[in-house]
Amino acid sequence: MRLVFAGTPAVALPSLRALIDSPRHEVVAVVTRPDRPAGRGRKIKPPPVHLLADEAGIPVLSPERPRDPDFLAALTDLAPDCCPVVAYGALLPREALAIPRHGWVNLHFSLLPAYRGAAPVQRTVLAGDDLTGASVFQIEPAMDSGPVFGVVTERVRPTDTSGDLLDRLADSGAHLLAAVMDGIDDGTLQAVPQPAEGVSFAPKLTAQDALIDWTLPAVAVDRLTRAAAPAPGAWTVFRDRRIKIGPVRLGAQNVPDELAPGRLVALADGAVAVGTGTAPVLLDEVRPEGRGPMKAADWARGARLTDDDLLHAPAERVSAAGSPAGAGGAP
């Protein structure tokens, strides 16, 4: 088939490579988001999919809006049989959906109808699910609601970050997407409507969502730090400045009894423990505001922790007794 592939970030690269390498299909063009500032220098850079298309000698379309008349005309001239999509990053108008003979087919990183939306992998890790997967479905105007051509399942490991899990799903999903293209091409594959039961949604994980509440159980803190890695990054406040917290570890040993939520202690072996609403957790990596990632033990030595130090939410003052200042008392 003649394919026009739509995708933008690195997670789409395995799928694009699989389709480029397929002897049964020809990727005649790639649609991606326009070049944007990236990195610490905020230099204008093409997205990863654009770079791979350039390497492969494939024409690239980068419309500001997919409903732009020039883009719709160019897509019509390409006469695609099907348009596979992986993390393109923009809503497709009805006019675009009607152009390919077999429509637009999307790789989504959940077992639909669960976790429709922008952040299925992050929400999977945050919920503590032990099974997830990827689905390939026909795009319809309603978000992630179209009939499904096929799925692949993936176990969620106890230490998975969102990045870890997404990398595996990107690889297994690429094989699934290529197989679906084959099935559509030879007419052996029909999409099945999604069930009405089990629908859930996965909105983007914001910076506010990634703020750690140290009064929550240790398992909830663990899930949040893994769900927010690598982005947007779980965070808290230390000495009036933000600090990002990498994935924590459960099962801290030899920690003082009843370590209050947010309280820090440097252990004899160099580890750094933090109190939560249940058991303490161990910090492995932190990123102080304005600095790069560093080992928690090195950060703690440099910070010279005191008994009064606390990780907390913004603008939360803490009394010497360990409770928020003013809590339960008269103003």
From Swiss-Prot:
EC number: 2.1.2.9
The keyword Protein biosynthesis appears for this protein: yes
Binding positions ((6S)-5,6,7,8-tetrahydrofolate): 110-113
Signal sequence annotation: none
Single Gene Ontology MF annotation: methionyl-tRNA formyltransferase activity
Region (Disordered): 312-331
Keywords: Protein biosynthesis, Transferase
GO-annotated cellular components: cytosol
Broad enzyme group: transferase
Catalytic activity, reaction form: L-methionyl-tRNA(fMet) + (6R)-10-formyltetrahydrofolate = N-formyl-L-methionyl-tRNA(fMet) + (6S)-5,6,7,8-tetrahydrofolate + H(+)
A Pfam family it matches: Formyl_trans_N
Transferase recorded as keyword: yes
Domain of life: Bacteria
Family to which this protein belongs: Belongs to the Fmt family.
HAMAP family in the cross-refs: Formyl_trans
Entry function: Attaches a formyl group to the free amino group of methionyl-tRNA(fMet). The formyl group appears to play a dual role in the initiator identity of N-formylmethionyl-tRNA by promoting its recognition by IF2 and preventing the misappropriation of this tRNA by the elongation apparatus.
NCBIfam families: fmt (TIGR00460)
The name this protein goes by in its record: Methionyl-tRNA formyltransferase
Organism: Frankia alni (strain DSM 45986 / CECT 9034 / ACN14a)
Source organism phylogeny: Bacteria, Bacillati, Actinomycetota, Actinomycetes, Frankiales
